[in-house]
Amino acid sequence: MIRVVLPHHLRTLAKVGDEVHVDLNGAVTAQVVIGALEDKYPMLRGTIREHKTLKRRPLVRFFACGEDISHEPPDAPLPDAIVKGEEPFFIMGAIAGG
């Protein structure tokens, strides 16, 4: 079971609490986690990554074990602590403005 923490606006859209869980078999990567999340909560499609390219949206960041992994390859394996459910995979909305 992978634990995922979503930003407030996506929790509201998906009508979920602070943390959601996805069950995965095989390799655990950011791409696989996001795909499982979008399958479980279809209303999130296009909010985290682009519809056609499946690339991360510019103002969305991914964190694993306290590290920003947003610019890592999306098919890179996530840390064991995420895979074992000891730590959550964080999806954060970046703050921008002037």
Language-model regions: role of each:
Residues 1-97:
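Ubiquitin-like/PB1-type beta-grasp interaction modules and other compact soluble beta-rich domains
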